[in-house]
């Protein structure tokens, strides 16, 4: 019994490290991409394209901050949060990085580059929204530990 509890504890700690690291990495990248957009892309992109790129940067930062806060507090929840955190990260990645590809692809790789990413953006957004809804539902249902 004690060994099983210890194994579960170790798995939770490893998961916390992974999601915390990935959230921190995504926050750092949102800062880098924001600076890249504000300086290097200003002369390359049209204002509407720059605004679209900025939406990806903004949501990447917001969603990554949320994942960081939750991953640092997994011990406070009376329910499993691992799947929710991974869904949040996947949704954020699909949403933001598909926007980056759609905006930057035509400028660097040709007019039709990354057009296939068009449907990926709303799928990533939906995954992000649903994962936050599941988190809130479970929080209301099970509360905190």
Predicted feature descriptions by range:
Residues 16-145:
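Polytopic transmembrane helical bundles with strong interfacial aromatic enrichment
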Residues 1-15:
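Positively charged, low-complexity/disordered segments
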